[in-house]
């Protein structure tokens, strides 16, 4: 990093501190800094203006960085909400993470024991729900959506619906039901309009990554914050309101450094949690100690809502597929096995189509756009291999076999494989077919937003 880049980064680090030293001028300064770093390019990493929402005539804007964050600013911008130039909700930054291996030592985490500001809990899979009051209305939000009832991941149920269900189970209040509106729900919970509430809901069978889901969704109180003199602070455990939430808190653990390391090291599949979470009640920081093997499973599963689509990202890697199948339900395994069968059928079909078009020279052959483009890719492979042979003086003996088709198919972008499977299961009508002599279809390889379901 050169001196100019270092100076710029130092300026960003200094400006990021605005989040914890808030004032009207600092709010505007932070908003300007965030907006300077916003990207709308889906292929780039950065900060997104994730959502806007009108609340009784006033427009809120929510900003959130892509995960994992790559700069100090991105690390802090995790569901920050503005009204104009005023920061309405700060949100908690991304957790710092450290992978704990069998060789990790207590010295590596000694800084977490330099003071008593850290609370230790199990790092469980789940989603943070934030609630705040604005312009005569309670807002239930996630990090990326101002309306949690419009935020979904892997499930037909929204995170707002899951939160409401967890509250119904927790309170056992017959007046809190599926039909209750947000304002009434928050009033029933006795929320203070001058404060912001952050809850953690456990993962369901549909929203989980690696750890087994709880039989029913559980809700925990994560923190209560309040903006006092234009500075957001975390409400102390000694505050009178905190007593009413004692039953809603996740159990705190009292572990010394060696015990914390050993706790995380001893976790194994199927994991009860990711590791340990250290939360600092004064600085908004959180630090996560993650079990090494858990992280390996998480990387295989990927942050992809659709289980079948996640599977397409690891095709050709038998070890990863074996790990993947350990994490998913029997129903999803059946779906994956159907995918595997369909892919084998595709390999045979694509090979036959290639022979028909490029060996038998059937220029009138019709096929759909995705297959047409894949056949062109196969033929490009053939021509490149032939040119290599010619350039070295070797006698060309290049053949496009089923093994070649399989290799190129399994190395294709997941959206391409997804479309091929979709078109195999639901063939296009003859009128929608495309001549193999037609030009290639779009080169857009961005992920399919609604992968097929089987």
From Swiss-Prot:
Coiled-coil intervals, chain numbering: 330-357
Swiss-Prot/TrEMBL keywords: Coiled coil
Region of interest: Disordered = 428-454
Family recorded in the similarity comment: Belongs to the IIV-6 393L family.
What is this protein identified as? Immediate-early protein ICP-46 homolog
């Amino acid at each position: 990093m050169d001196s100019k880049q270092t100076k710029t980064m130092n300026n960003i680090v200094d400006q990021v501190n605005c989040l914890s030293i808030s004032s009207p001028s600092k709010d505007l300064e932070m908003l300007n800094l965030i907006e300077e770093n916003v990207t709308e390019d889906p292929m780039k990493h950065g900060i997104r203006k994730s959502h806007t929402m009108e609340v009784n005539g006033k427009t809120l804007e929510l900003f959130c960085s892509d995960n994992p964050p790559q700069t100090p600013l991105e690390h802090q911008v995790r569901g920050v909400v503005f009204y104009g130039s005023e920061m309405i909700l700060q949100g908690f930054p991304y957790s710092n993470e450290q992978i704990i291996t069998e060789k990790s030592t207590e010295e590596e985490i000694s800084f977490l024991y330099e003071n008593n500001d850290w609370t230790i809990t199990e790092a469980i899979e789940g989603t943070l729900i934030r609630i705040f009051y604005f312009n005569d209305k309670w807002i239930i939000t996630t990090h990326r959506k101002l309306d949690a009832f419009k935020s979904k991941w892997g499930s037909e149920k929204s995170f707002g619906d899951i939160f409401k269900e967890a509250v119904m189970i927790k309170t056992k209040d017959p007046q809190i039901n599926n039909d209750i509106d947000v304002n009434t729900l928050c009033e029933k919970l006795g929320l203070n309009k001058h404060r912001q509430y952050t809850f953690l809901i456990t993962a369901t069978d549909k929203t989980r990554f690696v750890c087994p889901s709880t039989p029913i969704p559980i809700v925990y109180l994560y923190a209560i914050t309040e903006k006092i003199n234009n500075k957001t602070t975390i409400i102390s455990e000694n505050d009178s309101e905190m007593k009413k939430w004692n039953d809603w808190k996740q159990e705190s653990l009292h572990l010394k450094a060696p015990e914390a390391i050993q706790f995380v090291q001893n976790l194994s599949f199927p994991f009860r949690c990711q590791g340990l979470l250290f939360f600092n009640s004064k600085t908004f920081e959180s630090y996560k100690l993650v079990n090494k093997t858990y992280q390996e499973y998480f990387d295989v599963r990927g942050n992809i809502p659709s289980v079948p689509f996640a599977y397409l990202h690891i095709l050709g890697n038998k070890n990863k597929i074996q790990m993947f199948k350990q994490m998913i339900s029997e129903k999803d395994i059946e779906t994956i096995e159907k995918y595997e069968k369909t892919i084998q059928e595709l390999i045979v079909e694509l090979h036959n189509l290639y022979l028909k078009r490029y060996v038998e020279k059937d220029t009138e052959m019709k096929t759909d756009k995705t297959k047409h483009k894949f056949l062109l890719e196969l033929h490009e492979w053939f021509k490149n291999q032939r040119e290599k042979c010619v350039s070295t003086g070797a006698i060309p003996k290049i053949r496009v076999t089923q093994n070649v088709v399989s290799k190129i198919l399994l190395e294709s972008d997941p959206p391409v494989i997804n479309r091929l499977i979709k078109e195999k299961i639901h063939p296009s009508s003859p009128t929608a077919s495309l001549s193999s002599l037609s030009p290639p279809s779009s080169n857009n390889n961005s992920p399919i937003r609604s992968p097929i379901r089987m």
